[in-house]
Design a protein with these regions (language model features):
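Large intracellular
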Residues: 3-7, 15-142, 214-257
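Helix-termination/interfacial motifs at the ends of transmembrane alpha-helices
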Residues: 7-27, 131-210
Length: 257
């Protein structure tokens, strides 16, 4: 699991509340239920209105995916593909039928099975890349929900502040309460801006990044599957797949003992 999002969100909120304390403020003065209820509920409701029910019901799953991203290291994926290529070159493609069942990555496993079943290379490439494109579109929709929430939240907060100021004007006859009421009115704007920039927008950006990583790995797997099907030299397969990685992810090949 990559903890960057959890650490970043905690750090952002800690910095804000820490600054409030250092300035002599009371953290509980901004932990007001009505503004929180308005901002969170209004933001989620606005996002629901702008999409379809499937997008909204997937929020929890997308949130979990953003926070607990799991991926096979690229060098491990390449090692798996090279190992399969060596066996296929030595024993034939059909010999991979049992080995394919032990492959950890579902996409790679399905692609290998299709290759073993004799699917035409061009058709196999089209099917696998179509699956990558479909995943990319689905991930884009999931990230958009959080990006939209980040756009709505500040405006919802302003609505809360206006409502609070209306309440202030209703109590002008009680000057002793005005300071408290005005401060409370602006808490909604604070939570709107804070949740947008410290929660919703970062999660949306995280989902986009996770999608990029996962789709890149799927494309890497496609190239490996097609190379195995073509009977390519395992060393060439490894070199080709490593050439598709960013320089900082490339690890030197292990030399034979």
């Amino acid at each position: 699991m990559d903890p960057a999002s959890i650490i970043g969100i905690v750090l952002a909120f800690a910095a804000i509340f820490g600054a409030n304390i250092m300035e002599g403020g009371n953290p509980m003065s901004i932990m007001l239920v009505p503004p929180l209820n308005l901002v969170i509920g209004g933001t989620v409701g606005a996002a629901m209105a702008g999409g379809i029910m499937r997008d909204t019901t997937g929020i929890i799953g997308q949130l979990k995916r953003a926070m607990t991203m799991k991926k096979m290291p690229a060098d491990q994926l390449i090692s798996t593909v090279v190992s399969l290529a060596e066996r296929a070159r030595r024993e034939g493609l059909l010999a991979l039928e049992e080995a394919a069942k032990d492959v950890e990555q579902p996409f790679l496993r399905r692609g290998l099975q299709m290759a073993i079943d004799g699917t035409d290379p061009d058709e196999l490439s089209e099917i696998l890349y179509s699956e990558v494109d479909a995943k990319r579109k689905a991930d884009k929709s999931g990230a958009k929900v959080f990006s939209d929430m980040g756009a709505y939240a500040p405006t919802i907060g302003i609505i809360g502040t206006v409502m609070g100021l209306v309440h202030v004007l209703e109590n002008l006859s009680n000057p002793d309460e005005l300071g408290h009421l005005i401060a409370g009115a602006f808490v909604a704007t604070l939570w709107g801006v804070m949740t947008a920039n410290c929660l919703w927008l970062p999660i949306g950006a995280r989902l986009k990044r996770v999608s990029e990583i996962e789709c890149d790995q799927m494309e890497l797997a496609v190239e490996g599957i097609l190379a195995i099907q073509a009977g390519a030299n395992p060393r060439v397969v490894g070199q080709k797949l490593r050439s598709l990685l960013p320089p900082d992810e490339v690890k030197p090949e292990k030399k034979a003992a």
